[in-house]
């Protein structure tokens, strides 16, 4: 079981590495040339900047039982299809039960953007989000050990 991080814009890279170290779980950080992220204790793979280049590289590497950290619903859906466990930076685990609704929300938001309506941005990251992320990742890793 490997933890793969879609690291472009991911606020929990270091937190993931701390947790992975306790579980002796290997970590692969995937990013594009605009976000080169090197961390001790992880393998970093860097890809050309471009639409979905990191996403497709991650999907090509993920295996059943792996854990993926991403905030991208489309990538999450593809990883679920490959029998990976997937969570976002706030500790929400994507599942077959919630991914369709999340994909629909993404579609609706894109329609609003095309119509010139911009949804509010994300609020500042909180300690509670880190706690939820930690709890969810530890729960997943405990199931896989």
Language-model features: locations:
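Nuclease catalytic cores that cleave nucleic-acid phosphodiester bonds
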Residues: 2-145
């Amino acid at each position: 079981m490997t933890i793969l991080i879609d690291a472009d814009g991911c606020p929990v890279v270091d937190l993931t590495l701390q947790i992975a170290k306790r579980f002796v779980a290997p970590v692969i950080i995937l990013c594009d040339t605009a976000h080169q992220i090197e961390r001790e204790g992880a393998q970093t793979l860097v890809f050309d900047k471009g639409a979905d280049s990191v996403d497709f590289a991650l999907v090509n590497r993920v295996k059943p039982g792996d854990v993926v950290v991403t905030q991208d619903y489309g990538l999450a859906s593809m990883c679920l299809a490959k029998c990976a466990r997937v969570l976002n930076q706030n500790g929400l685990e994507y599942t077959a039960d919630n991914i369709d609704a999340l994909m629909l929300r993404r579609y609706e938001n894109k329609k609003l953007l095309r119509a010139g309506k911009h949804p509010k941005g994300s609020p500042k990251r909180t300690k509670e989000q880190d706690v939820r992320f930690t709890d969810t990742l530890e729960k997943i890793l405990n199931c896989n050990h």
